[in-house]
Amino acid sequence: MDYKKLVAERIKEHVDLELENIEKLIEIPPKPEMGDFAFPCFQLAKVMRKAPNMIAAELAEKINKEGFERVECLGPYLNFFVDKVAFSKNIISKVLEEGDKYGSSKIGEGKNVVVEYSSPNIAKPFHVGHLFTTAIGHSLYRMLNFEGYNPIRINHLGDWGTQFGKLISAYKRWGNEEALEEAPINELLRIYVKFHDEAENNPELEDEGRMYFKKLEDGDQEAVALWERFKDLSLKEFNKIYDMLGVDFDSWAGESFYNDKMDKVVEELEKANILTESNGAKVVMLDEYNMPPCIVVKSDGASIYATRDLAAASYRHKTYNFDKCIYVVGKDQILHFNQVFKTLELAGNEWAKNCVHIPFGLVKFADRKLSTRKGNVVLLEDLLNEAIDKTRETIEEKNPQLENKEEVAKKIGIGAILFTYLKNSRERDIVFDWKEMLSFDGETGPYVQYSYARAKSILRKAEEQKITAEPDFTKLTSKEEFELAKTLEGLQKAVILGIDKLEPSVVTRYSIEVAKAFNKFYNNHTVLNVEDEGLKAARLELIKATAQVIKNALFLIGIDVVEKM
């Protein structure tokens, strides 16, 4: 039963407002003693020509109270107190019946949503900054899918640009074939950094890099073969990371994919009469929108990444007919996307308003800079492995007899990192703190995973007791039991709000709420040793439902649960 909808229906019987509008006005009171749902009567004052306080008092008298413990007025608010036993039984039954689908819906049915995320640069390391976009995008994909949308995952690889000319030059001068086969990204990074170091004293190297990129653009056999090799070796390394994270994509079409699609974009902009020549370059002037010009073709005739993004957006709309196209890219690109979207709009594309850039913050880690050019980079693979190693040490210390130690260490270690990325608003910067991140207390991934494992441990012990009594839900009368059941009800609301805000942290924080409510309940009430068998069975059903909800919430943010810890 959807209690919020029930509240709206009961109010609708007495007021002239649309059901949907009533539902939107319903609030959750800040304190339990003020009820479980509250309806502010201010909006009715004008229509009913009465003070909100009087309206609330009248409605409290008239309203059908079936399914509610009581309905009271408090000033201008109409407060609903649900029947706690009926509510808890209803939620527990719903969770256990729907299982892995609990919290899902079909609200997005028939809607295509493109999600572009991860998008690492070929021949460069997958560093800790790349995980931010990957974690957010993968979580949004799961959330959208869960609520019935058709999400399309795109990895817009950085596989084109003048840097590939520099890389070809560097490889031909200093490349080590053996090192390239053994550790491709490390070797490509080494020669890339060397190129920049040498170019500081020998500017002619930059010309050589441009020359090799021109060869690549012109389809020179050797240049294309080297570029393809660098790309294949890089993807092989990237896939190791994606496998660790459980991430996949529907399309790997990178920047190079749009090379033959950019002329058409330029033609369309010329046809729309918005392309202007400026210092030899072709640009779209955006002064009246308080933005610098969007450069589409450089003065030397070369394309720029804005050109490729314009081509990519057009291609995606034609291919996927999207209702929304989401770009999960750092906040340093806000201006770039504003220029691209405005250019698409000025070219007469109505769908441009459905293109959304969702920016995210920076990743800070022990004063180390994330600069690929200087080679000073915190590699993501190293970070993930370090998290697994540290978790393994904790397991060895706390539970050396645990089975599947390696699998558990991997799930907790990687889960801890993902949780850290997705715990707060995505635009906030992340500062890594191993001690806090891997702690089993506080608002962390291990704390939520431990809560799940604790619930499963209780259920395994209960199985050994061979309990045959039917659950007596009328005995679930304590404050902690009701608060836990109430928290379990909120999964779908959290997911839908997370989708509306394009903010996975809503679901992450919800998982913390469930874990806290569960631990508060368990710390205040005995379960396995309670004498009343009906109450024991009811509490076990509540625990079973809690484990299911934690599992579903963690799945949505890309984290696996562990059965034992």
Curated annotation (Swiss-Prot):
Cited Pfam families: Arg_tRNA_synt_N, DALR_1, tRNA-synt_1d
Motif segment ('HIGH' region): 120-130
Keywords linked to the UniProt accession: Aminoacyl-tRNA synthetase, ATP-binding, Cytoplasm, Ligase, Nucleotide-binding, Protein biosynthesis
Disulfide pattern: none
Gene3D superfamilies documented for this protein: Arginyl tRNA synthetase N-terminal domain, HUPs, Isoleucyl-tRNA Synthetase, Domain 1
Compartments it resides in: Cytoplasm
Biological processes, Gene Ontology terms: arginyl-tRNA aminoacylation
GO CC terms in record: cytoplasm
Reaction catalyzed: tRNA(Arg) + L-arginine + ATP = L-arginyl-tRNA(Arg) + AMP + diphosphate
EC number(s) recorded for this UniProt protein: 6.1.1.19
Domain of life: Bacteria
Any one GO molecular function term: arginine-tRNA ligase activity
Top EC group: ligase
The keyword Repeat belongs to this UniProt entry's keyword annotation: no
Family label: Belongs to the class-I aminoacyl-tRNA synthetase family.
Subunit comment: Monomer.
Protein's name in the database: Arginine--tRNA ligase
Organism: Clostridium perfringens (strain 13 / Type A)
Gene name of the encoded protein: argS
